[in-house]
């Protein structure tokens, strides 16, 4: 949503509109959004501003169809914690935008910042739409076989359940 090229930003909204319509047609209630302002370029204040503007438009489109958008917490500084995701959830202030935390990415962020994954999850209280269960090791975010890394799955699942999460999706690598 935040690309510096206006044509790319416009195309992102067109794709989002089609995704929301498809979700509605299929009865899908939640779309997971990758928490990036930009992916193929360097982020800036302008990309973050454009991201927020287009995010607002996307959430308004989703609300019309009763589809919830949930940010996946990613591996980049832009949105690698629930707390960072919540800045945008609070900014947009619409019940059709929430957080879909990736506990592997959260675990790596917590290791980097010296913080607690469970405390970070708490910052999303009332706004967690589902939980993405994925394994990681410090500094590596993909292709880690389940239960060979450092994610404390029992603790994060318990915390998610305590916070009202009832939908869990796993990402497993073989």
Where are these regions (language model features)?
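Histidine-acidic metal/acid-base catalytic patches
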Residues: 27-29, 79-174
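Active-site acidic/histidine proton-transfer and metal-coordination neighborhood
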Residues: 1-99
